[in-house]
């Protein structure tokens, strides 16, 4: 165990065998090319599956749309940033000179949270990282009140509208990324092949841009008479 990380290991509830994985998971691209971005990509997928599985098993009467809505709530940026802060990840993030002061930024915390999950997965196995994730999420999952889950995020709402009308889901892609690291603007394009629609919007993160793109597509569908069925 690397001494300076012993406290962090205790907070995470996991001891890394290969500490270089953890260091990379904590390193922002403003510091070096060997940063957390690839681990973030991996961790995002691992987290999404673990949460989907636990919700599927715990809420056996929920329809697919409600499960998707609930998962979106649990893996959204704000939730991940809050969990990262509670695990003191902000105290260990490694930033370059251009990003100093960014330890508390929601986007960076969200990315690091997913990257640490990716690092734990590579350092161990799926069963281990699943156990760690569920420990972190236990207070949130145990406090879920289905009666209070009313507001859908735009991507989930769009998904329900399309599925209810037997239409394929849109494909999201990044068109451009403008600005410096700490003030980037993402332009995302959403394409619905079945409806021959192409919509774009901007946001300060990919996820925010995707949500705005979904909002625009919902408005266009509404004009065509396609609404969410209650």
Swiss-Prot record:
GO terms for biological process: mRNA processing; regulation of gene expression; rRNA processing; tRNA processing. Residues 153-223 form the DRBM domain. Keywords: Cytoplasm, Endonuclease, Hydrolase, Magnesium, Metal-binding, mRNA processing, Nuclease, RNA-binding, rRNA processing, rRNA-binding, tRNA processing. The keyword Acetylation does not apply. Pfam families: dsrm, Ribonucleas_3_3. Mg(2+) binds at residues 40, 111, 114. GO terms for molecular function: double-stranded RNA binding; metal ion binding; ribonuclease III activity; rRNA binding. It is found in: Cytoplasm. It comes from the Bacteria. It catalyses: Endonucleolytic cleavage to 5'-phosphomonoester. Coiled coil: none annotated. Homodimer. Belongs to the ribonuclease III family. Digests double-stranded RNA. Involved in the processing of primary rRNA transcript to yield the immediate precursors to the large and small rRNAs (23S and 16S). Processes some mRNAs, and tRNAs when they are encoded in the rRNA operon. Processes pre-crRNA and tracrRNA of type II CRISPR loci if present in the organism. This is Ribonuclease 3.
